[in-house]
Each structure stands twice: as C-alpha cells, then as structure tokens.
Regions:
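Alpha/propeptide regions of enzymes that mature by internal proteolysis
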Residues: 1-193
Length: 193
C-alpha cells in the first residue's frame, strides 16, 4: 500500500502530535498528546471506538467511547503513576477551550493511556506535572519527533529501547482514497518477566 505524505498519523487531516520529555540521570519519562482536530473537539465530536487487548492498563475514558462512539478530547499517553495528573490537565485544557463544559452541557470525557516505564525511569518520583501536558499540547505539530521522546522516553522492548512510532497508508475504496494513520507506543516485556 502507498504511504501517506509523511508516513505518519498526521497524514490524517487535522491530527497533530506533541511531546514533552523529561530526561535526567533518574528520569526517562514524558507525555505524548494527540490532538485529533483543529476544531473544538468537544463541540465537534469525532466518531471513535476502542479495543483493549491487554486489560492490565489503566487507560481512562474508553468506556464512554465504547458507549457513545465519540471522542471529545485530545488523547494523551504517559507513565502509569501519572495518569491522574495528565487526566486533570486535559480536563483543565478542555475547560479553557470550551466555556460550556459543566455549565450548559455535560462534563468532558478525556482519554489518557499509560505504560509502566519503571524499568528505565524512577516512576516513584511522580515527576509529570500538568505543565508538562500543556507543553506537549503547545508542541503539537504535523511533523513530530519519533523514538525515545515524550511518553516513549522510558519504554523498553525485550530489553531493547522502545518508544513512539507512527505510520500511514492510503487505501482506496469505491474509487476514493482514504488515509489510515497510527501512532504506537512500543513497550513489551520488562527484564524481570
């Protein structure tokens, strides 16, 4: 199949990706944010679905997606112990862009996924702050870094380095081209498993 222009999830119109990476002697962690639309996504919800293969994760927001079939917030990725912080930051971001949330409308369902980066990162430091999420949102762009960045900073894969990757393909259906994009956070098996 033919690749998209950038071979990236951002080949899908409107999608941007941003990172905030924390790197030091003991910290290898971060936040990756997928902004799925330039519009107010709360007012202009996108059709969405989810499928869980590994039910061990602590992802937030998937139940409402499965129930209603829509996405109404950015999607963020981080480490396991930072899900709550990142979730609250996304709520604050959404409240800042839509003044009707919780007043004239219902509340907002934000989506945060995680992986345990404790093999390479001092996860107990709980170093991620709301400001790191806002920085990742500010950094969102069509062209974005891949590899050991953002939420991929502390990822490992069979004792090799994991990270963030992306790709896209063009598919033709009924003589019309469609772009399929993907963003992956590669993290498989820790050294002690």
């Amino acid at each position: 199949m033919k690749k998209g222009k950038h071979n990236s999830i951002t080949d899908v119109k409107g999608i941007r990706v941003g990172h905030c990476t924390l790197e030091s002697e003991h910290l290898h962690t971060g936040v990756t944010v997928v902004l799925p639309s330039h519009d107010n996504i709360f007012q202009n919800k996108l059709i969405a679905a989810s499928h869980v293969i590994n039910g061990f994760g602590k992802t937030t927001g998937l139940l409402q997606i499965n129930e209603l079939g829509t996405l109404e917030s950015p999607i963020a990725l981080t480490n396991t112990l930072s899900v709550g912080t990142v979730q609250q930051a996304l709520v604050q971001y959404m409240l800042s862009i839509d003044k009707t949330i919780g007043k004239e409308t219902g509340t907002v369902n934000v989506v945060v996924g995680e992986c345990n980066d404790g093999y390479l990162n001092d996860i107990r430091a709980c170093a991620i702050t709301q400001q790191h999420v806002f920085e990742a949102i500010q950094n969102a762009n069509i062209i974005f870094e891949q590899g050991s960045v953002g939420a991929g900073s502390g990822m490992s894969c069979f004792e090799m380095k994991g990270g963030i990757g992306s790709g896209s393909r063009i598919v033709t259906l009924n003589q019309k081209d469609y772009t399929i994009g993907i963003l992956v956070q590669v993290h498989v098996l820790w050294h002690w498993i």
